[in-house]
Amino acid sequence: MSMFYVYVLKSERAEYHYIGSTEDLKKRIQEHNQGKTKSIKHLVPFKLLYYEAYETRTLARKRELELKRNSFKKKELFDRLER
């Protein structure tokens, strides 16, 4: 069974976090670090800060959007990561 992931990357160049979702986490991080995401290629390299695994793409996408749209949920997660 495939898993789907929601992930948080941190730029090693700037104080910037990127939230995304994917089925292949390793490949997606490589794509980010190869500059294949135009909107953030100027911020490479990235390191994986956090991820969550889900059984369906729908659940992963729902969580990704929740983190991107809900500043409280995002802040709550980032506060936990900083401990």
Give names to the regions the model predicted.
Residues M1-V44, L48-A53, T58-K68, F72, ...:
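GIY-YIG nuclease catalytic motif and its immediate N-terminal context
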